[in-house]
């Protein structure tokens, strides 16, 4: 019974770690690189709120407050924010490009990942990706830009809890290895009935210690 509760506590901890990596990446202050012509520097507020502001200057300020991309300068008190400051919920971002450890290609393109995967935040590489603002969202500046701080991880259909259940209940048939895409190893495990039980137990331990991962290099999917 103690072993069952211990495994249950470990499962909860693993799920929390996977969600923490994504949450910490989302909460970090995003750094953006705007493509094309750089946006002009912010107009001082004092220049817009001078003591001699009359009716004509009021209408001029109202026009500037619309903050469209066609204006020559960004009005900080207007209704529009910089497109590059928008949260991820308002952006359509492409998946990180896999350069397959080709540092030269990454330096030339200025975006993409050298490697994917990692169990902790420090192990996961973060890279730039191209993002585009959704069509119905109004903002100031270029609507397509590079956004930094995106974690280099892939999520497929591999779930840790499901794989662990397969390993504990059907591990002697190699079901866990089949689930991870390791077909050759799974057949060997099936023919030997889980290595007469020894291989079965070892794979359960490897899963719990995060030393047995999907064959395609993806991370455990934290989303159900």
UniProtKB/Swiss-Prot annotation:
Keywords: Glycoprotein, Membrane, Signal, Transmembrane, Transmembrane helix. Disruption phenotype: Viable but females are sterile. Reduced adult lifespan. No morphological defects of the eye, wing, notum or leg. Eggs produced by mutant mothers fail to hatch and embryos display neural hyperplasia. GO terms for cellular component: plasma membrane. Residues 157-205 form the TM2 domain. Disulfide bonds: none annotated. Residues 176-189 are cytoplasmic. The keyword Transmembrane helix applies. It is found in: Membrane. The keyword Zinc-finger does not apply. It is a multi-pass membrane protein. This protein is named 'amaretto' after the sweet almond flavoured Italian liqueur because of phenotypic and molecular similarities with TM2 domain-containing protein almondex. Positive regulator of Notch signaling. Maternal neurogenic factor involved in Notch signaling-dependent neuroectodermal specification during early embryogenesis. Functions cooperatively with amx/TM2D3 and bisc/TM2D1. Belongs to the TM2 family. This is TM2 domain-containing protein amaretto. The lineage of its organism: Eukaryota, Metazoa, Ecdysozoa, Arthropoda, Hexapoda.
């Amino acid at each position: 019974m103690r072993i069952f509760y211990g495994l249950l506590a470990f499962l909860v901890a693993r799920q929390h770690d996977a969600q923490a990596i994504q949450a910490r990446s989302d909460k970090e202050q995003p750094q953006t690189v705007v493509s094309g012509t750089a946006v002009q520097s912010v107009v001082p507020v004092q220049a817009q709120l001078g003591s001699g502001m009359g009716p004509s200057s009021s209408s001029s300020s109202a026009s500037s407050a619309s903050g469209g991309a066609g204006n020559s300068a960004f009005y900080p008190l207007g209704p529009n924010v910089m497109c590059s400051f928008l949260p991820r919920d308002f952006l359509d971002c492409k998946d990180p490009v896999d350069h397959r450890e080709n540092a030269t290609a990454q330096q030339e393109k200025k975006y993409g990942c050298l490697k994917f995967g990692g169990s902790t935040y420090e192990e996961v590489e973060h890279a730039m990706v191209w993002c585009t603002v959704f069509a119905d969202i109004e903002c100031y500046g270029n609507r397509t830009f590079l956004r930094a701080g995106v974690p280099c991880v892939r999520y497929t259909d591999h779930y840790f809890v499901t794989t662990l259940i397969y390993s504990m209940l059907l591990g002697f048939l190699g079901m866990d290895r089949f689930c991870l895409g390791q077909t050759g190893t799974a057949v060997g495990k099936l023919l030997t009935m889980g290595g007469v039980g020894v291989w079965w137990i070892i794979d359960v331990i490897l899963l719990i210690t995060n030393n047995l991962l999907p064959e395609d290099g993806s991370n455990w999917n934290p989303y159900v």
